[in-house]
Amino acid sequence: MYRIVMECRRLLPRRRSQTFGLSSSKEWPTIERIYVINLDRQPDRWVEVRRELRQIMDWSGAELGDLTERFPAVDARLFEQWPLKDEDIDPFYTLADQLLVEPQPQALPDRLELDRHIPMSQPEIAVARSHIGVWRRVAKSKHSYALILEDDVWFQPGFTRHLDEAWREIHAQGDKTIKFDILYVSYKEVKYGAQKTFLSRSVFRPVRGLWFLSGYVLSREGAEKLLRFLPCRGPVDLWINHQFGALDVCATRRSIIGQRRDGNSTNLYSILPSLTKIGVIDSESASLFQVRPAERPVFAFGPQGSGLSSLAMALSMLGYRCCSDLDELPTLEL
């Protein structure tokens, strides 16, 4: 039924947005480029997002597909070894980093839990590297603004109207023009709401507390700033919240780009075991796993690519201390 509804939307008349297109003939800057992050092994998603983009025209009447460039995503399956820290990625973060963005008033973790290093999952590292790659593309471009999309998005009803209203309010205020490095158009607020200040009727500035990077407008100056702030420490949508104080971040009054629910996510969320230990699985529900494991140790064997990383994540959520993706046991475990 969900897929049928998504297909039926495409029978509606195409919409036009004054925010997209070449800006040489416009009163204020426009979004001149769209980047879609897409894995080489998922061409069907690229086809779907292209169909989505064809439903919207820029201010001149051209399809948004004409402004769109596919950016090949980094594939975690191609990592030959666990990625190490480099100039772009620091693959360790802490529970304290997470709770700064999304506090959990019911949970009382001790200092040891707060400061323990959490390794990013390989898919999280791949996602971060993909976004960083697009930032470099934007920073080197001649375009003032670019829309960055992940390949599982869809434009919600009223997308063009809400975006045009926000864009007009941002740029049509004379000396009080709202400047931004990042404009979130797809996001989820933390459970208790993001602390924010409304700059206009359709635009607010968050202090922190916005999840997802599935759809956002990035300025060239914003891309340059993000690259200067590297390395990314933790999942990229978490890390970027920690940079809000040094960036001009805005968001549309509500999320106007959604993520499709009819595709399988390949991400592994490294924070889940730590949230489980303090009694929280995610922002929606309390942990069900409070009993310490009765059987130990547990060994699991399988060929590469058979899902051992996912099994280790599941065992961690059940309270086990895990070593995974190893060819031999570390000396400390013998």
Residue ranges of model-derived segments:
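PAPS-dependent sulfotransferase catalytic core
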Residues: L288-L334
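An acidic/histidine-cluster motif and surrounding catalytic segment
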Residues: Y2-L149, V153-V291
